[in-house]
């Protein structure tokens, strides 16, 4: 009985925050329209509003991951389209920070949930941009041998309807940022853990990577991170799982 009451209270709280997130989107959208009238004069205000939008999206993502089963839609998606949508979303930050972007594109098709994978790629890009002061970000695809690929027909091979039987491949997002301390690496996927970098940056929430791994595992994907202090960070997402049945 106590567990049931706690579950109901937890659901009520989740519903409340979900309603709050959806309601706050309306004034944010109105502000965005106002700022577009004089974009040059409102550039800094627009940047701050973008940060607010990202925090709101993170909260909404966190709430939805509590029960993703009803919100999952696995389809064969263009990985290139998903990546480019997120690049476009963060284009303003690339420009304002004068960071370079290297991405050649890919013809790969992935069996995934387009919205959720886009959310994860956005989180990784956001982190990379946040902790990169000079240089830039590079995005590429690797095959099962670790070789870079741009257009690989094997990645589009499918078997019977409802089955994805593609070659293993990994999406890599690398930056030239400040890197992650070695002692922090084993804990970066823990909920709320921010590490040394997070303690020096008040904007850190310790939620982005936690959500990213949780979502990717729900999709049958995996994520790993390699990093060197003052050299940068590489995030690898294995996006193909052989004989993954659609449901």
Predicted regions: what is each one?
Residues 128-129:
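Short helix-loop "hinge" at the ATP-lid/N-box region of the Bergerat-fold HATPase_c
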Residues 175:
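Acidic ATP/Mg2+-coordinating residue in the GHKL
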